[in-house]
Amino acid sequence: FHQVSGIHVRNALCDSFGYYQAANKVLAHGMMAASPMGKLRQLTVEVMQAQGLSAEQAERVVEEGWCIPDPVISAKQFTDTWTLFSYLHQQNIKIGIATSDDRAPTQAMIEAFDIEEFIATMVCSDDGIPSKPAPDMVTTICQRMNIEPSKAMVIGDTTSDLKMGRAAGAGLVVGVLSGVSAAKDL
């Protein structure tokens, strides 16, 4: 954004997003950990306005400078996802995905990991359904798969994931350490 606006905004953006620059780390309770891309984009506009730009100028700068990283390049599998999902599928366990990411990058990752055949349904942040920690993503997935939330397991790596699962009445809510949250937070 500095190249587009001439304003040094790195520190302000990192503070607003919940990114600790010195450790190169996303903070577990920060906006970057579980916020939809649209919300992060709007926050960027607000940060630019706080730097003295008008709403129109801030929107133009963000429009010109906004860049979404390639999800396939940035994604890291924490296990052999195909083998895990294949095994769950063989056990007749349905898999639904509720993500704070947008649909296009999520679909690209699913295709890159070659797991499309195992995903029964997914809800993404740009689907128009209230996002985490609201229960709506889980309840929507359960409705689509024709199961009661009390029969569902929600697995997540952020506190927003776990709050969403509990709010939806999931039968089991499991925190995993594959994301930015520490065990004490989950």
Each model region followed by its residue ranges:
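Conserved Lys-Pro-Asp/Glu-containing loop-to-beta segment of HAD-superfamily phosphomonoesterases
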Residues: K132-L162
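Surface-exposed amphipathic alpha-helices with a cationic face
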Residues: W82-Q90, C142-Q143, L162-A167
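Substrate-recognition element of Asp-dependent hydrolases with the DxDx(T/V) motif
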Residues: R60-G65, V72, T81-E111
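Acidic, Mg2+-coordinating phosphoryl-transfer loop and its flanking beta/alpha structural elements
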Residues: M153-L186
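Short acidic capping loops at alpha-helix termini that bridge into adjacent secondary structure
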Residues: E56, E116-T121, P149-M153, L172
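Histidine/lysine/aspartate-rich catalytic loop segments that bind and position anionic ligands
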Residues: T99-K132
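Phosphate- and divalent-cation-binding pockets in alpha/beta enzyme and binding domains
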Residues: P105-A108, T140, M164, D185
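A metal-dependent, Asp-based hydrolase signature
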Residues: Q3-C67, T79-T83, Y87-Q90
